[in-house]
Amino acid sequence: MAASKKAVLGPLVGAVDQGTSSTRFLVFNSKTAELLSHHQVEIKQEFPREGWVEQDPKEILHSVYECIEKTCEKLGQLNIDISNIKAIGVSNQRETTVVWDKITGEPLYNAVVWLDLRTQSTVESLSKRIPGNNNFVKSKTGLPLSTYFSAVKLRWLLDNVRKVQKAVEEKRALFGTIDSWLIWSLTGGVNGGVHCTDVTNASRTMLFNIHSLEWDKQLCEFFGIPMEILPNVRSSSEIYGLMKISHSVKAGALEGVPISGCLGDQSAALVGQMCFQIGQAKNTYGTGCFLLCNTGHKCVFSDHGLLTTVAYKLGRDKPVYYALEGSVAIAGAVIRWLRDNLGIIKTSEEIEKLAKEVGTSYGCYFVPAFSGLYAPYWEPSARGIICGLTQFTNKCHIAFAALEAVCFQTREILDAMNRDCGIPLSHLQVDGGMTSNKILMQLQADILYIPVVKPSMPETTALGAAMAAGAAEGVGVWSLEPEDLSAVTMERFEPQINAEESEIRYSTWKKAVMKSMGWVTTQSPESGDPSIFCSLPLGFFIVSSMVMLIGARYISGIP
């Protein structure tokens, strides 16, 4: 029997989408933007201490190999010729920090994840040394001094991990965010791997000047970071190197394919949603929640707690675009917490069913500040709370409150963005794994009181990376000209409650947020000076109140 003929679908482009919770490899038709096949692997997170979040860089890399291999197998089963994959793009969780040995190729410590809080004391120490004025870091980077960004994570590694210190002394250390680690490994690693990053990822390190688009010497000196360990900064769309995978790895089918696109995941989603015009915005619902608004070639600095960041630069000679961003630490992660920590649900999909059973939180409010509060508060002392509980409250109400929390946090960011831009959004474009939850999308429309618009193909983060890779000079299989971009079908969610009810729910949520603040400090419990014991008036009041209560009961003869 003659072998079946492989299908020819026009040039194909692959995309590695490496997120906090999972890794995926997806393949698109560059002429239609159709998703042809993909594979996903969940990634473990480690929590060695309270507030610490780590991942194994080698597990992340092997998950990429596995996803490439399995996706290629699936394409073969569909009779699609994988030799037609002309380029590969990378999108990645931002800020997560890796340091590795360029001689051995081994990571020198686990990846310190963007959610990690161990650097709060480092941040407080650095804030006391800011030269000149408190705007020193933000004016150059668009970012507040926070545990969120890579510079303080790298500073912690240099201060606390002897292997990292030794490798830096011996000129063997390389630093990078996840994109750098993957591109270096996929282009050969110790055998000529390319050590680079793109402008969007560099802009999240707190070491990168978003005006000059270069590593900033003053910032590196302030944080005490040796510049020789930093990756070369490139545009988001150019050929960085060719796939060069070890023969021991089955994913070698794509050997020699150029890696030609790289964007931090939120910038990739902005591109994938085709938000190329000033004022266009998207919100991605993943582990966290990230609302970006394209501000064009101009850096717009927020007065309301938002970040200024690089949106994209789609080619070496192309202009840079900036964005205002609101970041929420915990969105999809709250669903994972309900599943893994509380056991309220067995699968993430169950939460929609539970929420649908009651259709209300019944006055229960959930502030999932597990890693403090990000935009617009930037309050690391906050911690998660569930309040408004009664004897009537059950797991369905808590599930509903968890979904509402994601929507309320988005509302806070959108309000801040409207104040900064002066032009309220008429609708919100959304993407990310959580958008498959129809109750969440309807809640979001109700709480924002504007329509929520969701593309029928939700993989916009990977699509953005694929578009950047396919459009790169020397590849040229994907046109980004407006007239050539494929039309995307959309699902639209209209508000179904009145504006007054929306405002009442939102104002009650704001009260709950205030109650979540001020729960922790960086003061060591070993210092012998914890605040609860320092308050003599409070202690005296509690003891004397108890004495009076006991005395009153005794006098009145109450048993």
UniProtKB/Swiss-Prot annotation:
Read off the Pfam families from this record: FGGY_C, FGGY_N
Where glycerol is bound, by residue? R94, E95, Y148, D265, Q266
| Keyword terms, alphabetized | ATP-binding, Cytoplasm, Disease variant, Glycerol metabolism, Kinase, Membrane, Metal-binding, Mitochondrion, Mitochondrion outer membrane, Nucleotide-binding, Nucleus, Transferase, Transmembrane, Transmembrane helix, Zinc
InterPro entries according to UniProt: ATPase_NBD, Carb_kinase_FGGY, Carb_kinase_FGGY_CS, FGGY_C, FGGY_N, GK1-3_metazoan-type, Glycerol_kin
Task: Indicate which residues the UniProt annotation says bind beta-D-fructose 1,6-bisphosphate.
Answer: G252
Specify the signal sequence span.
Answer: none
| Disease tied to this protein | Glycerol kinase deficiency: A metabolic disorder manifesting as 3 clinically distinct forms: infantile, juvenile, and adult. The infantile form is the most severe and is associated with severe developmental delay and adrenal insufficiency. Patients with the adult form have no symptoms and are often detected fortuitously. GKD results in hyperglycerolemia, a condition characterized by the accumulation of glycerol in the blood and urine.
Q: What is this protein called?
A: Glycerol kinase
Quote the gene name from the UniProt entry: GK
